[in-house]
Amino acid sequence: MDLSNRRNPLRDLSFPPPPPPPIFHRASSTGTSFPILAVAVIGILATAFLLVSYYVFVIKCCLNWHRIDILGRFSLSRRRRNDQDPLMVYSPELRSRGLDESVIRAIPIFKFKKRYDQNDGVFTGEGEEEEEKRSQECSVCLSEFQDEEKLRIIPNCSHLFHIDCIDVWLQNNANCPLCRTRVSCDTSFPPDRVSAPSTSPENLVMLRGENEYVVIELGSSIGSDRDSPRHGRLLTGQERSNSGYLLNENTQNSISPSPKKLDRGGLPRKFRKLHKMTSMGDECIDIRRGKDEQFGSIQPIRRSISMDSSADRQLYLAVQEAIRKNREVLVVGDGGGCSSSSGNVSNSKVKRSFFSFGSSRRSRSSSKLPLYFEP
């Protein structure tokens, strides 16, 4: 056998050619990575949303449980109070300490007027500078009063406020916002007590207000309703202007306050200032006896005077002097004699005119003097 003719089996084996390099390898890797990134972002956002929702839900639940706990404690404490005092009744005064709507509407309203001062040449108010500023502004809203503006005046302390301001205040409070005086609208007078200001009769003639005031006549005439005791009537118009001369018409035992209140020029200083419908009126006490009247019909008068006013003290002494003289006349009448002056008069009267409400801000000038009548 020839060895050269033999074929090598290793040579006869043929190897396949190598595969060609991939052309789209980079494009396929980019396309597979994009969906993975999108899924990852969406998953992160969904997880964040779920976490936020969970935290919101937990916070709301905690707040609700806290409220429920507070309400439960409140109801439990309320039940305990009810068990301790089962007869306890709820009072609306505990909730609101203000005044009723009817009482608030009963507080008087008037128009604010400024008076021109010829000496100063400006519009001014009563009192000193601080008192003038306080009397011209509302202490609730701190705004100044305008001329012809409607205001409310507290009857007890005579302080002025805007209608809206004081109405809102009195709905929650029952006192004056300036002096803390309790507000009440009881304007009725007791049968044996008349509240009257201390002002001379001349001052009333100088005032030209449109307010009505009351004249109370106390007399002992029989069969006359007009002169019956404790009888009051309203005067307007001409009667109001003429009522300032009650002192001049009475010719006997007439008593008036001291003229020291009048300033130079015959006009009081406080009336040249701001005029606010103040509590001013004339005083005239006339004690007279008629021929046909019994001697026991004359009523003695006792009047309490505030000791901070010298003029009021003088008026009190003058009243006591008139009563003493009248008693002397009675003693002479019992003995058979009668003075000539006592026969010129007709009856026993006590006249007093005053405004329906007062508003002087100064305590000394606005002291109200009660008048007592003894049988």
Curated annotation (Swiss-Prot):
GO biological process terms on file: protein ubiquitination
TM region positions: 39-59
GO cellular component: membrane
Ranges in coiled-coil conformation: none
Catalytic activity annotation: S-ubiquitinyl-[E2 ubiquitin-conjugating enzyme]-L-cysteine + [acceptor protein]-L-lysine = [E2 ubiquitin-conjugating enzyme]-L-cysteine + N(6)-ubiquitinyl-[acceptor protein]-L-lysine
Pathway: Protein modification; protein ubiquitination
Keyword Repressor: no
Top enzyme category: transferase
Pfam families: zf-RING_2
Bilayer topology annotation: Single-pass membrane protein
Polar residues bias locations: 238-257
GO MF terms held by the record: transferase activity; zinc ion binding
InterPro entries in alphabetical order: ATL1/ATL16-like, Znf_RING, Znf_RING/FYVE/PHD
Keywords from the named record: Membrane, Metal-binding, Transferase, Transmembrane, Transmembrane helix, Ubl conjugation pathway, Zinc, Zinc-finger
Signal peptide start and end residues: none
Enzyme Commission numbers on file: 2.3.2.27
Annotated region described as Disordered, given as residue ranges: 1-20, 223-266, 356-375
Alphabetical list of PANTHER family matching this protein: RING-H2 FINGER PROTEIN ATL16
Name recorded for this polypeptide: RING-H2 finger protein ATL16
Gene of this entry: ATL16
